[in-house]
Amino acid sequence: MNLSPSRTPICAALAAALLGAAALAPAHAAQRILQLSEDTTHSKPVSAASALRGTPLAKAGAADRVCEAGAKWLRVGFKQLKLAGYDSLVLTSSGGDKLVFEGQHWNQRSFTTRPLRGECVDIQPYFSQPDSAFQLDRYDYSTVALDKATVVVAGAGDICDTSGNACQGTSDLIVSINPTAVFTAGDNAYNSGTLSEYNSRYAPTWGRFKALTSPSPGNHDYSTTGAKGYFDYFNGSGNQTGPAGDRSKGYYSWDVGDWHFVSLNTMSGGTVAQAQIDWLKADLAANTKPCTAAYFHHPLLSRGSYSGYSQVKPFWDALYAAKADLVLVGHDHNYQRYGKMNPDKAAASDGIRQVLVGTGGRAFYGISGSHALLEASNDSTFGVLKLTLSATGYTGDFVPRAGSSYTDHFTGTCNKGSGNPPTQTLTLNSVRDVTVKSGGSRDNGATLYADGSDGGQVLRGLMAWNVSSAAGKTLTGAQVKLQVSDRSTGTYDLYRAGAAWTEANASYSGVSLGSKIGSVVPSATGAQSIALNAAGFSW
């Protein structure tokens, strides 16, 4: 850049608009996210040598690589991922997919990523902090194309009544469907959810697939203090944690295929405890799956014996912000399917579909009234909900007990797959800057600095940025912002540097000019910007 002899200090920053996820509160509770897979999926451990390069934790360096010949896609399992400061970890597949981890959402979690297409995945750390590290433990793969890979989940709420006849019939449906996973939407064993009731009513029927079941509690389960019977049955007598989560909380999450499922507890007080909301937001922030479902007992909206419960709106607020897809509930003893809605119960194309399936076996409650979003309902058929899930959407079927004829069928596309990711703006200050002069001297008092003593020398201001925090994102625009504190005349051109340099060794002759990026005329003090052209995007 040629500068006039007037004094012109300029400081530089780089602003880039990128596609990425907005930051949410980090997860603090250590937990392992269970991954259940499709029938056509295989799993292999990652050898210590390839995962860790012979060290306990992988640090910055060359990319690790996980490969499986013939695979259509892979999921990478992390035993540990800890990111400090602005460090990031980038996964890039041979099929062209990319997944970027940044922030502290995954600290103290072990988890499995969403699928990445291709036979190989490169894991590249961009670490500058000593505390950042990662450790792999396994990977899943399939020779079946991703759009053909499906998994089945089934369940219901309000299940085993005192007679047991109806829940025997709905449990037979689950056995016939043969799902990968089963959910319950609460009130699993009547009347009070005691361990005796679970053992005598639930265990002989729905207990046949207990090993596949991820439950949630209802108000009848809490008729026994602390839902002791519920937790003793699913976790084991006296065990604090287990398949039903920590008995002091009753909420947890798990993954199946390319779906993230969240089991929530609507019985944590008259209103949902803030601790559960904070946990939910952190859990959703750490989720890498393209599709999300949540299930709990009380509905936001109902047209049966109840009209809905405002206490669950904080759940909906968090789920809607995270682009969740399905909410599965019970409490009203009937079947109701709603169109996609926002937390204010208004129709929304990016909303969540609520399916109320309180048809597991308890005596029916009648449907009462209507709602613009109520798409299907029935109050006389015991049955279960069957969900066939893919990486982009779902198919739902209400399956009736033998001898009944009512059915329902619906489909949907996952919100994250049907919309654009949010735009994030990053501002990166220059990490190196120095002015070099054609006479051989240098000055780094500012990015560009000229005064009357330069004697007609030609000056070049060198600037560099660390853009690792933008790794893996899609760049939609970028500009260099210059802060002018003393205006000058003339036009100053911005080029790519033609050689590597440091502030200590930079020289006018040692750094040639590359492609021209743009120009600025600093004729006024304050901010001046140069939009990057194609020459400035290859970074």
Swiss-Prot record:
Catalyzed reaction equations: a phosphate monoester + H2O = an alcohol + phosphate
Iron-sulfur as UniProt keyword: no
Top-rank EC class of the record's enzyme: hydrolase
Signal peptide bounds: 1-29
Propeptide positions: 30-148, 430-539
UniProt-listed SUPFAM superfamilies: Metallo-dependent phosphatases (SSF56300)
Enzyme Commission number(s) from the entry: 3.1.3.1
GO molecular function, one term: alkaline phosphatase activity
UniProt keyword RNA-binding present: no
Compartments it resides in: Secreted
The record's account of how the chain is modified after translation: The C-terminal Pro-sequence may be required for translocation of the phosphatase across the outer membrane.
Keywords carried by this UniProt record: Hydrolase, Secreted, Signal
Primary localization class, coarse: secreted
Transmembrane segments: none
Identification of the protein by name: Alkaline phosphatase
Species annotation: Lysobacter enzymogenes
Annotated gene: phoA
